[in-house]
Amino acid sequence: MKLADLSPPGQTVVTGSLLFTAEDIIAFAEKYDPQPFHTDPEAAKNFVFGGLCASGWHTCAGWMKMFVSYWAKEHARLVAEGIEPPKLGPSPGFKKLQWLKPVYAGDTITYSVTLIESRPLMSRPGTLINLTANQGVNQKGETVLRFESTVLEFD
């Protein structure tokens, strides 16, 4: 089975939702993005965001966490049904990354992926390159994150 057969271009798949707690935001930021508006709730009040908010990289990591979890379940489902899952990976990269709104402590972000196109990779026979649009939306329906990514697929 090919990815485009499983999820045709234009069809959006919700991969999961993630609650961003103050504790998680601080722990991630202390390790990877130690800026006061990510690590100190009191200091964060005096910055442009007006409160503690997640690092953009944390929101991206949340997307990856939800995608990996979703794909593991989908892969297992297909195998259980006797269907050979698409052979995906690695990703050559991403582009157009935008952090559109801050993600605050207490926000729940719902992540999704939409296949835009799947085409043969001319330099590698038997390989497709899939382009996807990805996003995260908060509980108010506001898009907080979006980017495009590519993933290889093999025969």
Where do the model's predicted regions map?
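Hot-dog-fold acyl-thioester-processing enzymes
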Residues: 1-92
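Short, Lys/Arg-enriched charge-dense amphipathic segments
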Residues: 40, 61-80, 98-108, 112, ...
